[in-house]
Amino acid sequence: TYRTFLALTSMCGTQGVNGGGWAHYVGQEKLRAMNGWAQYAFATDWSRPPRQMITTGFYYLTTDQWRYDNTKAARMASPLANRGTVGNKSTADTLIEAMKRGWMPSYPQFDRNPLVITQEAKDKGVPVAEYIVDELTNGNLHFACEDPDNPVNYPRILLNWRTNLLGSSAKGTEFFLRHMLGIDSDATTDEIKPEERPESIKWRDEAPQGKLDLMLTTDFRNTSTTLSSDIVLPAATWYEKHDMSSTDMHPYLHSFNAAINPPWEARTDFEVFRDLSAKLSELAVAWLGTQQDVVAAPLGHDSPDELNMPNGIVPNLDETGLIPGKTMAKLVPVDRDYTKVYEKWMHLGPLSAKLGTGVHGTPFNVEKQVEELRSINGESMTESAGMRPNLDTATKAIDMILRMSGVSNGEVAANGFANQAKRTGNEKLLELVDDVAGVRINWDMIKERPAEVITSPEWTGVKKGGRRYTAFSLNVEYNRPFNTLSGRMHYYLDHDW
């Protein structure tokens, strides 16, 4: 459906035009201050790369909905596509192939704990990436997605925060209840026939009922999810905490302000995660300590990874073999000190300034902003990285997000557009922020009234002169390349998949 709309709006020239185009509301560009938010949400100021899983793929396998789905991929292929490449693959087969090739993330990663895998590689004196490739090739190690009903591949703990998973966002709720939680359900659909089963996933005759060991939910309401949870943490609601929100329906940053303290045992979102990180760090002294992890990081869009398959031709793995970062996910060793999780939660890490930040392929240099945060938020000593800016309150975390995002800091936006202008040779992009370079939106401003965002390379709309936001106007009017291989709008009709 979306492709049909996008084809029509693109062919008619209405993309990037106020009143035209097709910018889906839900999830389109709701998270305005993305550059700073990504540093905070995924802890990339302290460690990279993060693990970020696709929700639909995770639950499709975890809730065993693939056992009931007989849809063939060819049914959804374009009439102009090379259907022979897709062949008789089921929907599940295409998902597994995409995960194994690194086109999509796949967590859990393998059928052995990554901490164990790195230790095995160390014991053999082999780089962990090389060891994993050898183990996969020899059949001693497998992708977890190939056997999601094997107990070694179950996700064991699920934390629900700001979501009524079972009552709202879960599609196929009865399968969540039956297979993920192992509780009463009204699922009545029959499993698919043997000849309809996916070829890429191991079929176990007895489907598991109850994969999770623990479901933890934090909420201020009693919902379908809290009723099915093992532990419920009472949460503060809107007028009991300091927080910030934005939406794709209008270009403003909003604050939540605490009128009262959270009653009884309720805690704010910030306090919940702060206290969990403190307890984890305390227990880690005796249990986990320092470990080396290995992250199977998917190939990134808006990056050179997109050039791994020239002309859209999918290589034959039997011919090329498994090559991390080329024909499979990147395999990145990451040192973890689990005793320092709390310390890192309370401070801004060094990587934002050292390695820079980036959104949608646009790099930002935020060294100056990190130094400014030392004065704005104060700083204190850490064992991990010396003196670091404080993030010990919710409002300090908000100020960090705003300081490091182009939509709220004109200097960051200008830096991003300067990087884009240098890469494209298009100096016209610099005009977009010549009147807002001095803008600095902070917590003190938005707690008084909503603040309107400014034009930033984080997104594709032009806000110059108070214009209403419309997606892709930046690309159409200022010739910023679209985020595609060609830099133009195109229709994905000439590749194998």
Predicted segments — roles?
Residues 1-217, 222-497:
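Domain-level signature for respiratory redox metalloenzymes
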